[in-house]
């Protein structure tokens, strides 16, 4: 990997280093692995990869940048000419159960509007069209931003999906429907097409979640402990989420979430003593350790989603290991009760909810 060394305004250089494994003891982890965009192989009907002038939103962003390959001028990749007619396809993969992505990628509507405005500002006599399913502009001043693109910059919005894109006589033929006009067919001859591809979880997110023992949803985005009350916390104590690793997010929401995670970490470190839930799992220790009912099968250790089950060796006075039993780490246990259900010898209980305690409560109710 590469590292940047030096000071701003002074000499700076990039130095290559080989990958290495670093082991550190930390008090908290903030997961900020971000997200990726859908592989364009998922929609061959759009012709990406087959036709050079069909690009993704990220590629268009680079074209429009002053530091990009064309110094900010919008030019076609095929011949370097300025496109006079451009089509933006929103929801390219998003909200499409057939592609396995039924969710909304959230950011596509806004950056597509921005890209269309940039095109109109740079190519004054050009025409821009946006195919969309619904305009989801849910942030502060987002709706006004989209209205400005339509009313002031003259971007043409067409409500409907694109069915097919192909090339004919040097033009890209975009075929779709306008659902606001009774699903009437629409055909546009474009010089360039930009696909607003869906946001998906990073490759390896599922493997990372399993290693860190944090939950994830069916789309491999990391799951928060509670969507309303604990949006930056995970079910594993000390591990927090920030940014688009949890779901596709824009910059303001990512910054707000990162600030919340930082506050949670600072609050954790400012405490002299860590506060934990009292209702945690405990292994039966009513008998002398040697006669513990735990048989050491460790099915509970395999089942525990928080890696809170450890192995404890019971030794005699000479240090000889007599038995290995399960032990619950109270700092990691979240009291979910999974280990209780898996324990064949019934050696684990939730503190405060043992069989004897629950039985006593039931008998007290019956007697009354």
Regions found by a protein language model. Give the residues of each.
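Residues forming the flavin
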Residues: 10-368
